[in-house]
């Protein structure tokens, strides 16, 4: 009897599947069961509407505490919302709203601790041009892609892995640190560790400072590799001294930064550097769940003739396999080809592994996240939602973009972040001094970085990532840089006179302030006689001594020049007719909302809250 041929069974996919609906969370902002629930920072106006309270009541809460620089557009801090809620007898709770439009940027995986395993650290090498970044990466990779950094451009997939002591390390291999900032501007926190390359014979240079600014702004730990120590004139101690002003010092100098000295060309110090990276990785315990559908970040992308859109991605969670359906922002597709940095075909990739993939319907952008799902239908729907989000974002005005440059610092004060570029160091110091002497209540400045030389693409990318304004002094700005700034919604201000820059900066700072509101008295009336009404309470027969009394206006009751109650004019009558206002030297009947203990000779003062000019 002939046996029927058996087919090879498709292996069972053991990865835990992502159920999109379980990660979506629509949050209704408002009061529920005595708890005020919100998702994002709220202005006073928004908060008042959500808790069904008049804006004036919220503003008066701050006025009573001596805080006058607030208005209906003021963004409330967490502490202020809590304080207001307690004042209103409410508890409060902040929750995150996750929709299909923002899922890729906000998904929080519910991995169990026992499912997490150690993953390789992801490292970016940064530093000044010609200080040896590419040579160091080549030395680590044990190849020689280029011997002249100034003319050489990295040609492989943008990342690779090396093994040291049976431990893997992933290096992001880019021509500079622009990609690092580009990804950060998109909210992609990919890098675990930055290796800062400094030439021992050259010391700290402008791009070294830029790299430090980028790393610190991203809150990423730094390892300093002092390169070219084989050259005459190389001085390790001088580099340590120069870099100490950036709060980067070795343990022997009282700091906690790891310093390694060596020579990339001679492959000296490489093992020590890799050991330092693994030590830092062990301290920080980088982990991920490999037994799940894939999630990761794009580091490079391009259109490859014959293969279509390609993307180099690094897996952050789960395992990516050939045949997986993935969504990368507005792009989606099925992974048809997956290769490592050497062009070898792979069938799967685990956390921290960099791979190049093909099979997408469009070219994604660096910094975009990808997510693997069970079906093509699911990834297409998610991609369509993301496209809708992009269309909405295109309608944001430049004014809205500018408003985002204002942030609240740790002291609750509004802060305008600046990047300053000047022709010479003397001008730079004068500008920094002039800015430090600007004193405007309720708003301050923070210099993200200040350096000499023309504005570069890196400056624009840092400004975009940190929501900063760029100030240019005695420098020309190329059309290329202006176009880039416009596309990234970065504001560049150019000056030749310092006092003019200070004047404009003061106006900007005042413009960043929320309009200040103050109380303005409309009129006063003295109570002469009282009537009691069974339905509406006490009616105060009054005489308007100044200004006018207006229905629904805010008011306060004064007795012996002391404010005893604040409310509003609930009802206003002239003789037998209900009216909206009563002028000076007229008699009227007044009902103060929710207040019946008014007495003869009390003063009813009517006022409004008006905007005050700040300059």
From Swiss-Prot:
Positions of region (G2): 152-156
Gene: infB
Top-level lineage group: Bacteria
Similarity annotation: Belongs to the TRAFAC class translation factor GTPase superfamily. Classic translation factor GTPase family. IF-2 subfamily.
InterPro entries assigned: EF-G-like_DII (IPR053905), IF2_II (IPR044145), IF2_N (IPR006847), P-loop_NTPase (IPR027417), Small_GTP-bd (IPR005225), T_Tr_GTP-bd_dom (IPR000795), TF_IF2_bacterial-like (IPR000178), TIF_IF2 (IPR015760)
Protein name: Translation initiation factor IF-2
Locations listed in the record: Cytoplasm
Pfam families for the chain: EF-G_D2, GTP_EFTU, IF-2, IF2_N
PROSITE patterns, per database record: G_TR_2
Region (G4), start-end ranges: 227-230
GO molecular function, one term: GTP binding
Residues spanning the signal sequence: none
């Amino acid at each position: 009897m002939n046996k029927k041929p058996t087919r090879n069974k498709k292996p069972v996919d053991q990865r835990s599947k992502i159920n999109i609906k379980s990660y979506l969370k629509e949050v209704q902002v408002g009061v529920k069961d005595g708890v005020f629930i919100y998702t994002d920072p709220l202005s006073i106006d928004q908060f008042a509407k959500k808790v069904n309270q008049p804006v004036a009541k919220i503003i008066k809460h701050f006025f009573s505490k001596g805080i006058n620089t607030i208005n209906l557009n003021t963004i409330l801090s967490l502490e202020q919302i809590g304080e207001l809620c307690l004042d209103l007898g409410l508890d409060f709770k902040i929750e995150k709203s996750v929709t299909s439009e923002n899922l890729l940027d906000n998904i929080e995986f519910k991995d169990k601790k026992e499912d997490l395993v150690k993953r390789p650290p992801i490292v970016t090498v940064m530093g000044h041009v010609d200080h040896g970044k590419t040579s160091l990466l080549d030395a680590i990779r044990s190849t020689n892609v280029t011997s002249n950094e100034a003319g050489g451009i990295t040609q492989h997939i943008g990342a690779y892995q090396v093994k040291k002591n049976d431990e893997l390390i992933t290096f992001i291999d880019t021509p500079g640190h622009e990609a690092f900032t580009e990804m950060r501007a998109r909210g992609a926190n990919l890098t675990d560790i930055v290796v800062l390359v400094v030439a021992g014979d050259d010391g700290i240079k402008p791009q070294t400072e830029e790299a430090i600014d980028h790393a610190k702004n991203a809150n990423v730990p730094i390892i300093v590799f002092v390169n070219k120590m084989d050259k005459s004139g190389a001085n390790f101690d001088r580099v340590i001294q120069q870099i100490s002003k950036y709060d980067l010092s070795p343990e022997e100098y009282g700091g906690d930064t790891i310093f390694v000295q060596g020579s990339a060309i001679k492959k000296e110090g490489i093992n020590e550097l890799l050991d330092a990276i693994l030590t830092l990785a062990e301290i920080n315990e980088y982990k991920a769940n490999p037994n799940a559908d894939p999630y990761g970040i794009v580091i490079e992308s391009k259109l490859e003739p014959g293969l279509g859109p390609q993307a180099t991605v690094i897996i952050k969670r789960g395992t990516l396999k050939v045949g997986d359906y993935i969504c990368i922002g507005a792009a989606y597709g099925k992974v048809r080809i997956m290769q490592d940095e050497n062009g070898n075909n792979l069938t799967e990739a685990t956390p921290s592994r960099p791979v190049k993939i093909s099979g997408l319907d469009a070219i994604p952008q660096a910094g975009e996240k990808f997510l693997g799902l069970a079906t093509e239908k699911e990834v297409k729907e998610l991609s369509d939602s993301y496209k809708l989000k992009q269309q909405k974002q295109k309608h944001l005005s430049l004014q809205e973009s500018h408003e985002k440059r204002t942030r609240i610092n740790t002291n609750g004060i509004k802060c305008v972040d600046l990047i300053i570029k000047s022709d010479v160091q003397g001008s730079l110091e004068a500008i920094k001094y002039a800015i430090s002497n600007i004193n405007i209540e309720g708003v301050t400045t923070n210099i993200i970085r200040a350096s000499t030389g023309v504005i570069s693409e890196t400056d624009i990318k840092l400004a975009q990532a940190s929501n900063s304004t760029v100030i240019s002094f005695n420098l020309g700005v190329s059309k290329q840089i202006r176009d880039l700034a416009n596309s990234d919604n970065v504001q560049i201000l150019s000056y030749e006179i310092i006092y003019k820059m200070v004047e404009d900066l003061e106006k900007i700072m005042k413009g960043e302030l929320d309009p200040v509101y103050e109380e303005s008295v409309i009129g006063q009336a003295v109570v002469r006689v009282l009537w009691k009404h069974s339905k509406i309470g006490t009616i105060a027969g009054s005489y308007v001594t100044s200004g006018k009394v207006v229905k629904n206006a805010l008011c306060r009751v004064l007795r012996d020049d002391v404010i005893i109650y604040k409310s509003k004019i609930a009802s206003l009558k002239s003789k037998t007719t209900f009216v909206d206002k009563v002028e000076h030297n007229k008699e009227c009947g007044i009902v103060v909302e929710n207040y019946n203990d008014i007495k003869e000779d009390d003063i009813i003062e009517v006022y409004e809250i008006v905007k005050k000019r700040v300059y």
